[in-house]
UniProtKB/Swiss-Prot annotation:
Pfam families: Ribosomal_L6. GO terms for biological process: cytoplasmic translation. Gene3D superfamilies: Ribosomal protein L6, alpha-beta domain. HAMAP family: Ribosomal_uL6_B. One of its GO terms (molecular function) is rRNA binding. Keywords: Ribonucleoprotein, Ribosomal protein, RNA-binding, rRNA-binding. This protein binds to the 23S rRNA, and is important in its secondary structure. It is located near the subunit interface in the base of the L7/L12 stalk, and near the tRNA binding site of the peptidyltransferase center. Residues 154-177 are annotated as: Disordered. Part of the 50S ribosomal subunit. The gene is rplF. This is Large ribosomal subunit protein uL6.
Protein backbone atom coordinates (compact mmCIF):
# COMPACT_ATOMS: atom_id res chain seq x y z
CA UNK A 1 0.00 0.00 0.00
CA UNK A 2 1.28 3.40 -0.99
CA UNK A 3 1.76 5.84 1.85
CA UNK A 4 2.03 8.69 -0.68
CA UNK A 5 -1.43 8.04 -2.17
CA UNK A 6 -3.10 8.15 1.25
CA UNK A 7 -2.29 11.82 1.87
CA UNK A 8 -4.52 14.26 -0.06
CA UNK A 9 -3.34 17.22 -2.16
CA UNK A 10 -4.44 20.54 -0.64
CA UNK A 11 -5.18 23.28 -3.15
CA UNK A 12 -3.76 26.76 -2.41
CA UNK A 13 -5.75 29.92 -3.15
CA UNK A 14 -6.06 30.69 -6.86
CA UNK A 15 -5.65 27.08 -8.05
CA UNK A 16 -8.53 25.28 -9.77
CA UNK A 17 -8.74 21.57 -10.57
CA UNK A 18 -11.15 20.12 -13.15
CA UNK A 19 -11.64 16.37 -13.39
CA UNK A 20 -13.17 15.11 -16.65
CA UNK A 21 -13.17 11.31 -16.67
CA UNK A 22 -9.50 10.29 -16.72
CA UNK A 23 -8.26 13.82 -17.54
CA UNK A 24 -7.20 16.18 -14.77
CA UNK A 25 -6.63 19.87 -15.57
CA UNK A 26 -4.94 22.18 -13.06
CA UNK A 27 -5.17 25.94 -13.58
CA UNK A 28 -3.39 28.61 -11.55
CA UNK A 29 -1.76 32.02 -11.62
CA UNK A 30 1.28 30.89 -13.63
CA UNK A 31 -0.56 28.79 -16.23
CA UNK A 32 -2.36 25.48 -16.68
CA UNK A 33 -1.32 21.83 -16.94
CA UNK A 34 -3.15 18.64 -17.94
CA UNK A 35 -2.54 15.01 -17.03
CA UNK A 36 -4.09 11.76 -18.26
CA UNK A 37 -4.75 9.48 -15.26
CA UNK A 38 -4.26 5.70 -15.54
CA UNK A 39 -7.49 3.65 -15.62
CA UNK A 40 -6.56 1.81 -12.39
CA UNK A 41 -6.67 5.12 -10.46
CA UNK A 42 -9.65 7.25 -9.38
CA UNK A 43 -9.22 10.97 -8.64
CA UNK A 44 -11.82 12.95 -6.67
CA UNK A 45 -12.16 16.60 -5.65
CA UNK A 46 -13.99 17.65 -2.47
CA UNK A 47 -13.76 21.01 -0.64
CA UNK A 48 -10.47 22.14 -2.17
CA UNK A 49 -8.77 18.79 -1.53
CA UNK A 50 -7.80 16.31 -4.26
CA UNK A 51 -7.66 12.66 -3.19
CA UNK A 52 -6.31 9.72 -5.18
CA UNK A 53 -7.37 6.09 -4.70
CA UNK A 54 -6.87 2.90 -6.71
CA UNK A 55 -9.96 1.16 -8.15
CA UNK A 56 -8.84 -2.18 -6.74
CA UNK A 57 -6.59 -3.06 -3.81
CA UNK A 58 -3.73 -4.43 -5.95
CA UNK A 59 -0.08 -3.52 -5.51
CA UNK A 60 0.05 -2.02 -9.01
CA UNK A 61 -3.06 0.06 -8.28
CA UNK A 62 -1.54 1.52 -5.11
CA UNK A 63 1.79 2.16 -6.86
CA UNK A 64 0.04 4.04 -9.69
CA UNK A 65 -2.09 5.95 -7.15
CA UNK A 66 1.07 7.11 -5.34
CA UNK A 67 2.68 8.18 -8.61
CA UNK A 68 -0.49 10.01 -9.71
CA UNK A 69 -0.75 11.81 -6.37
CA UNK A 70 2.90 12.96 -6.63
CA UNK A 71 2.36 14.17 -10.22
CA UNK A 72 -0.81 16.07 -9.25
CA UNK A 73 0.99 17.66 -6.29
CA UNK A 74 3.81 18.78 -8.62
CA UNK A 75 1.23 20.22 -11.04
CA UNK A 76 -0.46 22.18 -8.23
CA UNK A 77 2.90 23.49 -6.97
CA UNK A 78 3.95 24.37 -10.53
CA UNK A 79 0.88 26.46 -11.42
CA UNK A 80 0.95 28.16 -8.00
CA UNK A 81 4.68 28.87 -7.51
CA UNK A 82 6.59 27.39 -10.47
CA UNK A 83 9.85 25.46 -10.48
CA UNK A 84 13.40 26.55 -11.12
CA UNK A 85 16.76 24.86 -11.60
CA UNK A 86 20.11 26.65 -11.34
CA UNK A 87 23.19 25.69 -13.35
CA UNK A 88 26.79 26.90 -13.04
CA UNK A 89 29.46 27.01 -15.75
CA UNK A 90 33.00 26.34 -14.53
CA UNK A 91 35.86 26.67 -16.98
CA UNK A 92 37.99 29.27 -18.73
CA UNK A 93 35.90 31.05 -21.37
CA UNK A 94 32.67 29.17 -20.55
CA UNK A 95 29.76 31.58 -20.99
CA UNK A 96 25.97 31.55 -21.27
CA UNK A 97 23.66 34.15 -22.77
CA UNK A 98 19.86 34.00 -23.04
CA UNK A 99 18.30 35.58 -26.14
CA UNK A 100 14.54 35.07 -26.28
CA UNK A 101 13.82 31.36 -26.84
CA UNK A 102 17.49 30.48 -27.50
CA UNK A 103 20.25 29.83 -24.96
CA UNK A 104 23.68 30.53 -26.43
CA UNK A 105 26.53 28.64 -24.78
CA UNK A 106 30.28 28.90 -25.27
CA UNK A 107 31.70 25.71 -23.78
CA UNK A 108 35.19 25.38 -25.20
CA UNK A 109 34.12 23.76 -28.46
CA UNK A 110 35.23 25.09 -31.84
CA UNK A 111 31.64 26.30 -32.32
CA UNK A 112 29.06 28.00 -30.09
CA UNK A 113 26.11 25.89 -28.91
CA UNK A 114 22.61 27.34 -29.50
CA UNK A 115 19.99 25.47 -27.45
CA UNK A 116 16.38 26.02 -28.56
CA UNK A 117 14.13 26.26 -25.48
CA UNK A 118 10.85 24.32 -25.47
CA UNK A 119 7.47 26.00 -24.97
CA UNK A 120 6.73 26.92 -21.34
CA UNK A 121 10.37 27.36 -20.28
CA UNK A 122 12.08 30.67 -19.53
CA UNK A 123 15.81 31.12 -18.95
CA UNK A 124 17.66 33.90 -17.15
CA UNK A 125 21.41 34.45 -17.02
CA UNK A 126 22.14 36.59 -13.92
CA UNK A 127 25.85 36.38 -14.76
CA UNK A 128 27.81 34.87 -17.65
CA UNK A 129 28.47 31.69 -15.66
CA UNK A 130 24.99 31.18 -14.15
CA UNK A 131 21.82 29.85 -15.76
CA UNK A 132 18.37 29.84 -14.10
CA UNK A 133 15.75 27.66 -15.81
CA UNK A 134 12.12 28.36 -14.82
CA UNK A 135 8.78 26.81 -15.70
CA UNK A 136 5.56 25.31 -14.34
CA UNK A 137 6.21 21.72 -15.45
CA UNK A 138 8.70 20.10 -13.05
CA UNK A 139 9.60 17.30 -15.45
CA UNK A 140 10.26 19.71 -18.34
CA UNK A 141 12.39 22.05 -16.19
CA UNK A 142 14.51 19.11 -15.05
CA UNK A 143 14.81 17.74 -18.59
CA UNK A 144 15.97 21.09 -20.01
CA UNK A 145 18.52 21.41 -17.19
CA UNK A 146 19.78 17.88 -17.92
CA UNK A 147 20.00 18.63 -21.66
CA UNK A 148 22.06 21.79 -21.05
CA UNK A 149 24.31 19.93 -18.58
CA UNK A 150 24.82 17.12 -21.13
CA UNK A 151 26.60 19.50 -23.54
CA UNK A 152 29.61 19.55 -21.18
CA UNK A 153 29.17 17.48 -17.98
CA UNK A 154 31.63 18.24 -15.16
CA UNK A 155 34.85 16.28 -15.59
CA UNK A 156 36.46 14.67 -12.52
CA UNK A 157 40.02 16.03 -12.83
CA UNK A 158 39.61 19.79 -12.95
CA UNK A 159 35.84 20.04 -12.34
CA UNK A 160 35.24 22.02 -15.54
CA UNK A 161 31.85 21.85 -17.21
CA UNK A 162 28.18 22.60 -16.62
CA UNK A 163 26.89 21.51 -13.22
CA UNK A 164 23.79 21.95 -11.09
CA UNK A 165 24.19 24.66 -8.44
CA UNK A 166 23.83 22.12 -5.61
CA UNK A 167 25.92 19.38 -7.28
CA UNK A 168 29.09 18.05 -5.65
CA UNK A 169 31.55 16.72 -8.24
CA UNK A 170 33.83 13.92 -7.08
CA UNK A 171 37.36 14.89 -7.97
CA UNK A 172 40.09 12.45 -8.97
CA UNK A 173 43.80 12.82 -8.56
CA UNK A 174 45.92 12.88 -11.71
CA UNK A 175 48.14 9.87 -12.37
CA UNK A 176 51.66 10.25 -11.07
CA UNK A 177 54.73 8.91 -12.88
Amino acid sequence: MSRVAKSPVNLPKGVEVKIDGQKVAVKGGKGSLEHEVHELVAVSLEDGVVSVKPHDDSQKGWALAGTTRALLNNMVTGVADGFERKLQLLGVGYRAQAQGKVLNLTLGFSHPVAYQLPEGITVETPSQTEIVIKGIDKQLVGQVAANVRAFRPPEPYKGKGVRYADEQVRRKEAKKK
